[in-house]
């Protein structure tokens, strides 16, 4: 896939804040987890005015938009609860932009997943986390 609007290379380690570095590490851990389960990376950190798509992977014939969430504790519902309806709508609009840019009018089967990375390194992969 060519670099351009809506894509960027793997996370940088330069002048990143500790929170950004932790987020980069969570995304990388989530990607390894997904790849270990047969997914193939299509794009990462695709940015649009509506928001950022953390990971885009292909699982068999399905294009999967993956939101990676990291939380230090399960307080306030944990990582999964932080993907509220507002965030879901932003992700859906960003995904529409990505699909139009990369797939034109022939959209593949798609879904939205959430990978929750806990502070202790455990992960929960929520397939079909929400519908758009």
Predicted regions and their residues:
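Domain-level recognition of nuclease-like catalytic cores that cleave nucleotide substrates
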Residues: 4-6, 101-132
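Acidic-basic catalytic patches of nuclease active cores, encompassing PD-(D/E)XK
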Residues: 1-44
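Metal-dependent nuclease catalytic cores in nucleic-acid-processing enzymes
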Residues: 92-104
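Short acidic/glycine-enriched loop/turn segments that link adjacent beta-strands
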Residues: 49-51, 120
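Residues forming the ATP-binding cleft of Hanks-type serine/threonine protein kinase domains
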Residues: 46, 69, 129-130
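Hydrophobic residues on conserved beta-strands that form the core of alpha/beta folds
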Residues: 41-43, 65, 112
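Conserved catalytic cores of phosphodiester-cleaving nucleases, focusing on short active-site segments
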Residues: 34, 53-78, 83, 91
